[in-house]
């Protein structure tokens, strides 16, 4: 069976090309275009050429006078030409920004400016090959379906042929769009054209739809703002009644523009109260203040000074400052005065914005603050002062505890303890006591022993130990000590017996500590020595008698007038010093007796330094 295709009437019909161009333009602009194309694609030229396609009949399923159904193999290599015009974006940065969300873009200024260039594209040398299913009916028109991708190749000529990468890019993009056109859009275009030709009902229906879709723009326009909303409110959020709306409309139509819908006003208030995010209905976070809100704009409640009663600008409803009607107490007045005098916090209207969250919920009536007691140990010039002071307020008890003690000299008298100002300020933390940098560091027991050894070796007299560390102490008392209760308390226990061959020193009472003046080593003095101390006295070089019957009061007597802390520290130091002296005496006597020679002095022999005493 043979068919003759009359291709010349299609080329001679001018109306056919016009309708085909309109349908192709609509089809090309219907699908999503790449971001580089910034204008509509317009088909300016369409020519099917003089060479018709070749059809090979593979199957005929239905054949009648008014219908036909068959499967063909189509091949086309004609001289058809298609010309398109559009505008492209030559700035790649602008193309990138168009494909990204504006919230995440860096918002450049000059670099984001678009550069639009007109583009003309001509498609020629189109080669098609594929299997086509053709269905014809006078009632339903012509339906053409491609079972495979028919496009084999085509030639794309554009304005940017001199730029290789632009030419290749356009070639690839246009081929992709044409494949979509042949598979999806071309069957629909052919079907609509056939309905216009053979179906009068479809043509009338299409004309009616075009009139409804594109109404005529003739006639005066209508202002939608002149019609009030269903639930109008004024600029202050007050709902307007029908009579008020009528009175407003009688005066002039200008005031109608200031009416707001109540729903829109609530949405704007919710947007103002939101966390400045993209979502309009972000759930609120309780007891959270955003530091970006606490700016100078809140002093005037917005740049325009307008205050909305529904939601104040840049503020939260649960963070408003509530002013109590009750008068301030004396403690509140003092705390307010101290907070006003403190430099560092601005005294503006929004300075307490972030600190007053939940002020209405956590009132002062049911709060229980802990007591803050600061004991002042500083010496005062007045005979009697209040050493203990209580700072801070207590809502549970109104009692004030004041402890009056006597001023006592202590080793901590040189340090300065500043007054604490506890104003319950949540912003400014309490200042730690500042220590005076010129205060002399207190010497430990090891420091005093090392100083004494150095002075003994170099025969240099050391300065006396300060009075707060105790009095000078002798190696061996030359006079009987007065027996009193303090001396009996500080008497050290007898040292433990070490070995049977070591010398056992006699029991020695600890005298008030005195400074040991060093003297040059010399021959033993001819002063009478008691028999009980003859063995121990031979191990030491004689000292000049610097002791008298009248001893100064010991440090224990001074400690009796001090505080309990000072007495305990003095007792501990006295017992430790007495123990160390007894250990030194016993070790020195044992080493001297074991050597069996008295030619060398005490410091000529090897001396192991005592271990460090940590207190």
Swiss-Prot record:
This is Mitochondrial distribution and morphology protein 34. It is a multi-pass membrane protein. Transmembrane segments: none annotated. It comes from Paracoccidioides brasiliensis (strain Pb03). Residues 325-342 have a biased composition (Polar residues). It is found in: Mitochondrion outer membrane. InterPro entries: Mdm34 (IPR027536), SMP_LBD (IPR031468). Component of the ERMES/MDM complex, which serves as a molecular tether to connect the endoplasmic reticulum (ER) and mitochondria. Components of this complex are involved in the control of mitochondrial shape and protein biogenesis, and function in nonvesicular lipid trafficking between the ER and mitochondria. MDM34 is required for the interaction of the ER-resident membrane protein MMM1 and the outer mitochondrial membrane-resident beta-barrel protein MDM10. Keywords: Lipid transport, Lipid-binding, Membrane, Mitochondrion, Mitochondrion outer membrane, Transmembrane, Transmembrane beta strand, Transport. Lacks alpha-helical transmembrane segments, suggesting that it resides in the membrane via beta-sheet conformations similar to those predicted for other outer membrane proteins and porin. The SMP-LTD domain is a barrel-like domain that can bind various types of glycerophospholipids in its interior and mediate their transfer between two adjacent bilayers. GO terms for biological process: mitochondrial genome maintenance; mitochondrion-endoplasmic reticulum membrane tethering; phospholipid transport. It comes from the Eukaryota. The keyword Transmembrane applies. Signal peptide: none annotated. Residues 325-347, 379-552, 592-615 are annotated as: Disordered. GO terms for cellular component: ERMES complex. One of its GO terms (molecular function) is lipid binding. Residues 394-410, 528-541 have a biased composition (Low complexity). Belongs to the MDM34 family. Component of the ER-mitochondria encounter structure (ERMES) or MDM complex, composed of MMM1, MDM10, MDM12 and MDM34. Residues 444-459 have a biased composition (Basic and acidic residues). Residues 1-195 form the SMP-LTD domain.
């Amino acid at each position: 069976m043979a068919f003759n295709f009359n291709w010349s009437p299609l080329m001679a019909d001018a109306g056919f090309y016009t309708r085909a161009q309109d349908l192709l333009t609509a089809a090309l602009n219907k699908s999503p275009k790449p971001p580089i194309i910034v204008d509509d694609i317009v088909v300016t030229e369409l020519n099917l050429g003089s060479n018709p396609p070749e059809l090979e009949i593979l199957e005929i399923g239905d054949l009648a006078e008014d219908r036909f159904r068959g499967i063909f193999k189509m091949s086309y290599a004609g001289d058809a030409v298609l010309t398109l015009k559009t505008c492209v974006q030559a700035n790649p940065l602008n193309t990138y920004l168009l494909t990204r969300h504006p919230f995440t873009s860096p918002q450049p200024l000059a670099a984001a400016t678009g550069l639009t260039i007109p583009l003309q594209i001509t498609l020629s040398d189109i080669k098609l090959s594929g299997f086509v299913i053709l269905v014809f009916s006078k009632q339903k028109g012509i339906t053409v379906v491609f079972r495979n991708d028919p496009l084999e190749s085509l030639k794309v000529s554009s304005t940017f042929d001199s730029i290789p990468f632009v030419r290749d890019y356009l070639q690839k993009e246009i081929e992709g769009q044409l494949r979509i056109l042949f598979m999806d859009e071309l069957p629909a275009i052919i079907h609509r054209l056939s309905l216009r030709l053979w179906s009068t009902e479809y043509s009338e229906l299409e004309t009616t739809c075009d009139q409804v879709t594109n109404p005529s723009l003739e006639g005066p326009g209508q202002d939608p703002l002149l019609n009030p909303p269903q639930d109008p409110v004024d600029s202050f959020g007050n709902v307007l009644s029908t009579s008020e709306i009528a009175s407003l409309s009688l005066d002039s139509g200008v005031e109608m523009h200031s009416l707001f819908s109540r729903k829109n006003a609530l949405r704007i208030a919710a947007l103002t109260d939101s966390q400045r995010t993209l979502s309009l209905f972000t759930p609120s976070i309780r007891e959270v203040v955003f530091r970006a809100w606490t700016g100078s704009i809140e002093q005037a409640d917005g740049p325009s000074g307008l205050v909305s009663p529904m939601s104040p600008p840049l503020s939260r409803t649960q963070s408003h400052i509530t002013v109590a009607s009750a008068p301030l107490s004396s403690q509140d007045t003092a705390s307010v005065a101290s907070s006003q005098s403190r430099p560092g916090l601005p005294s503006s209207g929004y300075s307490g914005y972030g600190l007053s969250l939940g002020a209405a919920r956590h009132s002062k009536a049911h709060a229980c603050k802990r007591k803050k007691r600061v004991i002042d140990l500083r010496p005062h010039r007045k005979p009697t002062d209040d050493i203990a002071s209580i700072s801070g307020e207590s809502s549970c008890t109104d009692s004030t505890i004041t402890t009056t003690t006597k001023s006592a000299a202590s080793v901590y008298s040189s340090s300065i303890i500043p007054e604490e100002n506890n104003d319950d300020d949540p912003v400014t933390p309490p200042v730690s006591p500042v220590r005076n940098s010129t205060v002399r560091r207190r010497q430990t027991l090891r420091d005093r022993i090392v100083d004494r050894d150095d002075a003994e070796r170099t025969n240099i007299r050391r300065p006396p130990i300060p009075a707060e560390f105790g009095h000078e102490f002798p190696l061996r008392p030359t006079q009987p000590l007065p027996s009193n209760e303090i001396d009996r308390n500080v008497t050290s226990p007898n040292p433990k017996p070490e070995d049977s061959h070591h010398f056992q020193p006699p029991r020695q009472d600890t005298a008030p500590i005195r400074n040991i003046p060093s003297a040059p080593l010399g021959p033993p003095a001819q002063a009478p020595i008691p028999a009980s101390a003859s063995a121990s006295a031979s191990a030491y070089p004689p000292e000049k008698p610097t002791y008298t019957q009248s001893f100064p009061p010991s440090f224990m007597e001074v400690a009796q007038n001090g505080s309990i802390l000072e007495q305990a520290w003095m007792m501990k130091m006295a017992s430790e010093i007495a123990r160390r002296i007894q250990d030194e005496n016993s070790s020195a006597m044992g080493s001297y007796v074991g050597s069996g020679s008295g030619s060398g002095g005490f410091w000529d022999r090897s001396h192991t330094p005592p271990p460090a005493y940590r207190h």
